[in-house]
């Protein structure tokens, strides 16, 4: 049997392998598939080359999973509206996978990660037209909350959706989805097997917060309100 795997605008044909599973079984074992998804993401994040000094450990988030499920049930092979992808004040990113047969979640995540074959750290996609956004979202250092869901849309159409909070793939930084260096180099006292466990609880609203804080410190309420991560997270990953 041939399985058709689609990643956004990229279509590829895969041979059926041992990675295929019964969809009902995969969907019903909620705790099992949550652990499989989180463990797979963290394993891949630990294995990046070059290694990452600021890679956060991912954890499951039920709100992100609910948002992913609502979108998966629409059976639409397109990204959900950004305003529907939020967890608290965090905006979330999204990866989508479609197949003509069910896949194990570990296989879905691996397919996204495999775009690394056309990605060069510090340069970006190579050749430039290559699709690599799924890979960069999987390994985006700051994305640490994860929620995923799937839907059987027809006998030959299965949709898988993961949402990542806060969102990755920030314009201007896509070529460096994390900071290279020794594992946990930026979090030596908050490290779990190569991944940082100290995410900042705040999120900056401006892209130039480091410059603003360096120049003006955090002396005004405006800067503190717009740049809370830079102002208040001195030892956490931001």
Swiss-Prot record:
Signal peptide range: 1-19
Tissue: Expressed by the venom gland.
Domain ShKT as annotated: residue spans: 200-233
Keywords linked to the UniProt accession: Disulfide bond, Ion channel impairing toxin, Neurotoxin, Secreted, Signal, Toxin
UniProt keyword Cytoplasm present: no
Major localization listed first in the record, in broad terms: secreted
Entry keyword annotation includes Signal: yes
Pfam families recorded: CAP, Crisp
Coiled-coil ranges per UniProt: none
Cystine bridges: 75-153, 92-165, 148-162, 184-191, 187-196, 200-233, 209-227, 218-231
Residues that make up the propeptide removed upon maturation: 20-28
Molecular-function annotations in GO: ion channel regulator activity; toxin activity
Segments forming domain SCP: 38-164
Compartment(s) where it occurs, according to its Swiss-Prot or TrEMBL record: Secreted
InterPro entries from the UniProt entry: Allrgn_V5/Tpx1_CS, CAP_dom, CAP_sf, Crisp-like_dom, CRISP-related, Cysteine_rich_secretory, SCP_CRISP, ShKT_dom
GO CC, alphabetical: extracellular region
Domain of life: Eukaryota
Function per UniProt: Blocks olfactory (CNGA2) and retinal (CNGA1) CNG channel currents. Does not affect neither depolarization- nor caffeine-induced contraction of smooth muscle.
Protein family: Belongs to the CRISP family.
Name of the molecule in the record: Cysteine-rich venom protein pseudechetoxin-like
UniProt source species: Pseudonaja textilis
């Amino acid at each position: 049997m041939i399985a058709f795997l689609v990643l956004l605008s990229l279509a590829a044909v895969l041979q059926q392998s041992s990675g295929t599973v019964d969809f009902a079984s995969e969907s019903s074992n909620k705790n099992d598939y949550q652990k499989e998804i989180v463990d797979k993401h963290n394993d891949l994040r630990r294995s990046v080359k070059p290694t990452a000094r600021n890679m956060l450990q991912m954890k499951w988030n039920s709100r992100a999973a609910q948002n992913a499920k609502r979108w998966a049930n629409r059976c639409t092979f397109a990204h959900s509206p950004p305003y529907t992808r939020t967890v608290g004040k965090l905006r979330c990113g999204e990866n989508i996978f479609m197949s003509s047969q069910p896949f194990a979640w570990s296989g879905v995540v691996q397919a996204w990660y495999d775009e690394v074959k056309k990605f060069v750290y510090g340069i970006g996609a190579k050749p430039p037209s290559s699709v690599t956004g799924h890979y960069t979202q999987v390994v985006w250092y700051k994305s640490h909350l994860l929620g995923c869901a799937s839907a059987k849309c027809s006998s030959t159409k299965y949709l898988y959706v993961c949402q990542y909070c806060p969102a990755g793939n920030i314009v201007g930084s896509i070529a460096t989805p994390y900071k290279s260096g020794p594992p946990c180099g930026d979090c030596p006292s908050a490290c779990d097997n190569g991944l940082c466990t100290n995410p900042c609880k705040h999120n900056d609203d401006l892209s130039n917060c480091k410059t603003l804080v360096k120049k003006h410190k955090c002396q005004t309420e405006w800067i503190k309100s717009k740049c809370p991560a830079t102002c208040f997270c001195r030892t956490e990953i931001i």
